[in-house]
């Protein structure tokens, strides 16, 4: 010890004394621990003292004080360590024990949050120590040093032993009775401090990782409650059996200890080692998840499903009335049960269901809407589970719309199923027997409410419904308070707080999220008040996100505003701009999720916007469309495909995930931003048929600028196109002739110039050109030109092409020219069944003929046979004047054009020129001022 200058003694232990010393060689303070003089002659204790030093020296971890030097050549033996200024955990605990009031500084140091952070560091250290095969055996507040700079280190390794090593029986023999009344580490048969020993350790069983975990449990109990788990006087014998440890929540309710942490402590202090944590790693993960706010669930309520007291409402309902998308009988009666329990915005529900219950279908609503008792319970989120033919299907429902579905075959003959539903941190998750089935992200504030179920028979719920509360985070989100105000429709109060948070955290997630929610708040207020000025303020609020770290949210917010205002062109523009400009932005997935939801919403309503959102989803998230949804979409589009010329002329199947589907959707919606990419894709693949179809659609939609650019590209590259020996349906020469014919139509040249110069074209290309020419000629009141064009190509197309694709144009021309005799001859060739088939345009043309020869009443009587369940594009005029009428917002852009063309001809046949000319004007305006 000659090398060190001893300053003062700073501590004493069972075998050693610790001094503050100065090392002049290294110019630093050190802690020097030497064996007590009265024990220095005992070789066994000397070996134990040196073993402590070597164990500490072998452990390299921030939570273990490293050893600088070990001196064992002659007495006194000692070792040196860094000197850490601080105090023990015991000192800190003693400073607050039995005190009624604490200073602000001390209250912060001993808060649950501060202590839990320290305990997590302790767990990390012991996890490392156990990984090295070492047991501490004497974990207690005395042996935990808290440094002035947030260090938390484990002291006193004198009792440490390697896992599985036999207990060292020292020469000091202490009776069991003396051990049980001692608070000191006894260098005898039982090593450690009895108050921190597990029950099995007190009975003489060897130490284990589980006994260290028990000791940590006693430490954590004191940290949480500021009291000891055993209520006994000093010196009183510890009772090994039958002593109940009260939970931390019971002992210190004023400390607001989360139920989850209370459960963690009680698990650590379980009498049976098998019921404790299996490792410190498992314990540390639970503590980490709590600190991070990850969900760890604690059972708060067990709801007996068969007791009437569990439910605020339990009434029979017709399921189809509220969930028409579900595959159930219209007369299926179920029970709607709404709980008495108010759920939290973060919660977990557990149900044990019989197979019979799932065969009949089971619904979960979380939470029900404000108007649940008034029959409006289906607003919000819910899950529907149903087994059919050994396949379990789970549907996620939002505002009565199925937005997600997952199906899986059941391999075993299970008779019971554990269903769990979690709502946590923007996500809704459903688990079946521990397996994740569905996860949905919702980025608007969650709210609390009542839990509801829909079930055929309560007997199918086999056990109590478990309602679990999330452990939550010790750091409550600053958004929680304004979120609560928003959920309660206290818009002004929510807005003030959101703006304050946004200004306080510029550039941080909390800040931009608050700014976005401020916009949502203004939007909700505007919708409630139906105030146009407030909608403008919502746009202004979202604009504050411009070019910031969450720029995509500006456009998502604006899209929501335009949706409420029914300004759908602006809504789509906002979404497109964000998708294009911020395709790689971390927040863009929120916007993509919204686009997918808008598809589900508009498709369920059979709204015309479904076609537009289908285009977007097929580009950004095609996997979001399930096989079941794909089947329904294709069925819905089938009638439109039968009225689409390029689908009729192309025998290939129209598949959902295909370039042809994108073109088809563009044609019917009039939404063409993707037309350019479709062109380049087909051009790169030399797919001439696809190029012809694209040019046909562009010409029909009057997209002359696009066509002009395509013609320029074609002219530039025509010389590079080499002839191929492979026989192809269309050559690039055909494509060129087709393009120039389209250009002639645009220039409004006569039929002879268009068709005579292209007399070598195939029948398919002639049909395309004739269709475009005839539609233009009719709307320009040039019915005679249709006859001229027909004469030029009649001999160049097969007879079936004439009947399938040209005859209707010929009938229109006769109607325009009022050729009653010719029309009579034509219609005599059709049966009454054919003339009344509303799937074909002949149905409408015959109605126009009746209007021409008999008047409006005869035509409307003919139109009155339309079906109620379907609307066919070919017979829109008939449905418009039918008693059923056309549903609002149902007609796509192309259908509105088609209807105006049909009405234009119909009013001409009636001799109502004013209405006819109005339809003509509206048709041209619709083309010029495109509206989704």
Swiss-Prot record:
Autophosphorylated on serine and threonine residues. CDD domains: STKc_PknB_like. NCBIfam families: PRK13184.1 (NF009651). ATP binds at residues 10-18, 33. SMART domains: S_TKc (SM00220). It is an enzyme of class 2 (transferase). It holds the Pfam family Pkinase. PROSITE patterns: PROTEIN_KINASE_ATP (PS00107), PROTEIN_KINASE_DOM (PS50011), PROTEIN_KINASE_ST (PS00108). InterPro entries: Kinase-like_dom_sf, Prot_kinase_dom, Protein_kinase_ATP_BS, Ser/Thr_kinase_AS, Ser/Thr_kinase_PknD, TPR-like_helical_dom_sf. Its EC number is 2.7.11.1. SUPFAM superfamilies: Protein kinase-like (PK-like). One of its GO terms (molecular function) is protein serine kinase activity. The keyword ATP-binding applies. Keywords: ATP-binding, Kinase, Nucleotide-binding, Phosphoprotein, Serine/threonine-protein kinase, Transferase. Together with the serine/threonine kinase Pkn1, may play a role in the specific interactions with host proteins during intracellular growth. Residues 4-291 form the Protein kinase domain. This is Serine/threonine-protein kinase PknD. Transmembrane segments: none annotated. Disulfide bonds: none annotated. Belongs to the protein kinase superfamily. Ser/Thr protein kinase family. It catalyses: L-seryl-[protein] + ATP = O-phospho-L-seryl-[protein] + ADP + H(+); L-threonyl-[protein] + ATP = O-phospho-L-threonyl-[protein] + ADP + H(+). The active site is at 138 (proton acceptor).
């Amino acid at each position: 010890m000659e090398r060190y200058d001893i300053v003062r003694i700073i501590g004493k232990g069972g075998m050693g004394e610790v001094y503050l010393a100065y090392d002049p060689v290294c110019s630093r303070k050190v802690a020097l621990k030497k064996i007590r003089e009265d024990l220095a002659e005992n070789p066994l204790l000397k070996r134990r003292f040196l073993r402590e030093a070597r164990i500490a020296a072998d452990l390299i971890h921030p939570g273990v004080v490293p050893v600088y030097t070990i001196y064992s050549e002659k007495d006194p033996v000692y070792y040196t360590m860094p000197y850490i200024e601080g105090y023990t955990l015991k000192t800190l605990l003693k400073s607050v024990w039995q005190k009624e009031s604490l200073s602000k500084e001390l209250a912060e140091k001993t808060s649950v949050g501060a202590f839990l952070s320290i305990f997590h560091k302790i767990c990390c250290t012991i996890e490392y120590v156990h990984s090295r095969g070492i047991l501490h055996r004497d974990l207690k507040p005395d042996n935990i040093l808290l440094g002035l700079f947030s260090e938390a280190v484990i002291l006193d390794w004198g009792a440490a032993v390697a896992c599985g090593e036999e207990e060292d029986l020292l020469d000091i023999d202490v009776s069991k009775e003396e051990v049980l009344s001692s608070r000191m580490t006894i260098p005898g048969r039982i090593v450690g401090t009895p108050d921190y020993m597990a029950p099995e350790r007190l009975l003489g069983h060897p130490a284990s990782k589980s006994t260290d975990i028990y000791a940590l449990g006693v430490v954590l109990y004191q940290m949480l409650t500021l009291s000891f788990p055993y209520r006994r006087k000093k010196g009183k014998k510890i009772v090994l059996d039958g002593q109940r440890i009260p939970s931390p929540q019971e002992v210190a309710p004023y400390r607001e200890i989360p139920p989850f942490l209370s459960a963690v402590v009680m698990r650590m202090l379980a009498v049976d080692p098998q019921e404790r944590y299996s490792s410190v790693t498992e314990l540390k993960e639970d503590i980490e998840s709590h600190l991070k706010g990850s969900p760890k669930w604690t059972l708060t309520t067990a709801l007996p499903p068969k007791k009437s007291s569990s439910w605020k409402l339990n009434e029979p309902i017709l399921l189809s009335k509220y969930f028409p998308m579900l595959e159930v009988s219209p007369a299926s009666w179920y029970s709607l049960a709404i709980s008495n329990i108010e759920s939290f915005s973060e919660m977990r529900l557990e149900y044990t269901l019989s197979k019979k219950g799932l065969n009949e279908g089971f619904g979960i609503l979380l939470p029900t809407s404000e108007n649940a008792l008034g029959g409006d319970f289906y607003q919000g989120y819910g899950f529907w589970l149903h087994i059919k033919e050994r396949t379990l299907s789970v549907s996620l429902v939002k505002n009565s719309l199925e937005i997600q579905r997952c199906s899986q075959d059941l391999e075993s003959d299970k008779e019971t199923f554990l269903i769990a539903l979690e709502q946590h941190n923007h996500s809704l998750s459903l688990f079946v027997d521990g397996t994740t089935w569905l996860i949905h992200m919702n980025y608007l504030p969650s709210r609390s409410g009542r839990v509801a179920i829909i079930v055929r028979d309560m007997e199918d719920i086999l056990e109590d419904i478990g309602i679990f509360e999330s452990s939550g985070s010790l750091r409550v989100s600053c958004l929680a308070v304004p979120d609560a105000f928003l959920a309660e429709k206290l818009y002004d109060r929510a807005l003030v707080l959101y703006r304050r948070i946004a200004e306080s955290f510029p550039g941080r997630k909390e800040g931009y999220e608050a700014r976005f929610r401020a916009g949502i708040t203004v939007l909700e207020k505007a919708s409630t008040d139906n105030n146009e000025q407030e909608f403008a303020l919502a746009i202004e609020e979202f604009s504050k996100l411009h070019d910031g770290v969450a720029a995509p949210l500006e456009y998502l917010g604006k899209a929501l505003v335009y949706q409420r205002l029914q300004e759908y062109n602006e809504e789509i523009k906002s979404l497109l701009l964000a998708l294009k400009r911020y395709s790689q932005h971390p927040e863009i997935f929120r916007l993509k999720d919204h686009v997918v939801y808008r598809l589900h919403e508009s498709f369920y309503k059979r709204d015309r916007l479904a076609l537009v959102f289908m285009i977007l989803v097929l580009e950004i998230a095609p996997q979001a469309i399930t096989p079941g949804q794909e089947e329904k979409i294709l069925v819905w589009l089938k009638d439109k495909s039968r009225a689409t010329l390029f689908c009729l002329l192309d025998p290939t199947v129209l598949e959902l995930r295909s370039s042809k589907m994108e073109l088809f959707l563009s044609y019917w919606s009039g939404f063409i931003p993707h037309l350019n990419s479709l062109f380049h894709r087909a051009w790169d693949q030399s797919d001439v048929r696809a190029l012809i179809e694209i040019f046909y659609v562009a010409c029909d939609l009057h997209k002359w600028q696009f066509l002009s650019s395509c013609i320029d590209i074609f002219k530039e590259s025509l010389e590079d196109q080499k002839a191929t020996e492979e026989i192809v349906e269309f050559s690039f020469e055909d494509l060129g002739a087709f393009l120039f014919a389209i250009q002639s139509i645009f220039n409004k040249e006569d039929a002879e110039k268009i068709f005579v110069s292209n007399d070598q074209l195939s029948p398919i290309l002639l049909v395309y050109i004739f269709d475009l020419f005839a539609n233009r000629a009719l709307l320009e009141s040039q019915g005679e030109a249709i006859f001229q064009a027909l004469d030029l190509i009649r001999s160049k197309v097969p007879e079936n092409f004439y009947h399938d694709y040209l005859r209707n144009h010929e009938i229109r021309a006769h109607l325009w020219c009022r050729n009653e005799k010719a029309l009579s001859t034509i219609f005599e060739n059709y049966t009454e069944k054919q003339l009344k088939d509303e799937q074909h345009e002949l149905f409408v043309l015959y109605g126009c003929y009746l209007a021409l020869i008999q008047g409006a009443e005869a035509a409307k009587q003919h139109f009155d046979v339309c079906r109620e369940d379907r609307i066919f594009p070919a017979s829109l005029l008939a449905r418009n004047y039918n008693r059923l009428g056309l549903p609002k917002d149902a007609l796509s852009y192309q259908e509105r054009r088609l209807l105006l063309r049909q009405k234009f001809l119909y009013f001409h046949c009636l001799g109502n020129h004013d209405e006819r000319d109005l339809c003509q004007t509206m048709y041209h305006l619709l083309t010029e001022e495109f509206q989704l």
